[in-house]
Each structure stands twice: as structure tokens, then as C-alpha cells.
């Protein structure tokens, strides 16, 4: 998929920060597999998978499962990225019931392979305490191998960069 329109990366000099609006720009699953086949197993490779920008909510799980199955032979672990603020509507991805369904679906698929792979969950930094508690409970219940905290924040609080500049870049 194309990702978000360019410019997608903005430096905030006064804040020693960056605004990232990449949007999962990439050449696609097949192109990734071509590159991964070149790996001579000298490195540990992780598969960071997420929904496509255009995928409607009823297709989210299918996106994850398709990527998981196709990449399984080529990666050492997986990251279920449910935290990218740059791929359109992602509120459902942080819903406890949906997350449980997604994790269990991926774990079921993982169990069909001769060698299962570790699965981690990448979460957003802007979750509220209730959401964090639910995710911690879910990670413990499903016995995921870990959590990656965190992805890009959508918060623009406490920045030195002036509001006019922030509005002009997003």
C-alpha cells in the first residue's frame, strides 16, 4: 500500500522530536517474502503485522492471519501491531473483545505449524488506564510472549513547538 501522502515525517527541532505519519507504506506481502527469502539466518527477524489502511473493520482479523501464515516460514517472532495511528480507524483494535478474538485466532493458526513462533503485542501510548488494565489482563490470560510499548503518540501536549507550526504539519 502507498501509505499516507508525502510529506510523512516532520522534525520538531525545539522538542527533539518527530511527527510520523508513514501509514505502513510498503511494497506488499509478496515483496517482503522475496526479501526475507534472501536472509541467511544470520539475524533474528520479526514480522510486524497490522491491518491495511483500506481494510474495513470486519476484515481486520483476516489481514493479520494472511500475513501471519505467509510470513511464518521466514520470521522468528511476530508482532501484532494494533497501535498504528496512521492507518485510519484503529479504535476497534484496542477493544478488549476484538483483541481477544484476534489473539486467539492468531494463536490457533500458530498452533497448526510444526514450530510455533513467539507472539508479541504492540500497543499505543495513548491508551487510558482502563484500556491498559484490560490489555495487561488479556496478555496474561492468552500467555502472549510479550508487549512492545509503544508506538507513535497522537498527543501534541507539552510541546515547545508553536501551535501554528503543529497545525500546518499535522
Predicted segment positions?
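Conserved alpha/beta-domain cores
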Residues: 23-170
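Flexible glycine-/small-residue-enriched beta->alpha junction loops
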Residues: 2-29, 35-39
Amino acid at each position: 500500500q502507498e501509505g499516507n501522502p508525502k510529506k510523512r515525517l516532520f522534525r520538531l527541532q525545539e522538542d527533539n522530536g518527530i511527527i510520523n505519519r508513514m501509514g505502513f507504506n510498503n511494497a506488499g506481502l509478496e515483496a517482503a517474502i522475496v526479501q526475507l527469502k534472501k536472509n541467511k539466518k544470520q539475524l533474528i527477524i520479526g514480522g510486524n503485522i497490522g491491518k491495511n489502511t483500506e481494510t474495513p473493520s470486519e476484515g481486520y482479523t483476516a489481514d493479520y492471519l494472511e500475513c501471519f501464515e505467509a510470513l511464518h516460514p521466514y520470521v522468528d517472532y511476530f508482532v501484532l501491531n494494533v497501535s498504528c495511528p496512521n492507518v485510519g480507524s484503529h479504535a476497534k483494535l484496542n477493544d478488549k473483545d476484538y483483541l481477544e478474538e484476534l489473539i486467539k485466532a492468531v494463536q490457533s493458526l500458530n498452533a497448526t505449524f510444526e514450530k510455533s513462533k513467539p507472539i508479541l503485542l504492540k500497543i499505543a501510548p495513548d491508551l487510558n488506564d482502563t484500556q491498559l488494565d484490560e490489555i495487561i489482563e488479556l496478555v496474561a490470560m492468552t500467555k502472549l510472549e510479550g508487549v512492545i510499548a509503544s508506538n507513535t503518540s497522537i498527543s501534541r501536549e507539552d510541546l515547545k513547538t508553536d501551535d501554528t507550526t503543529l497545525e500546518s504539519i499535522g
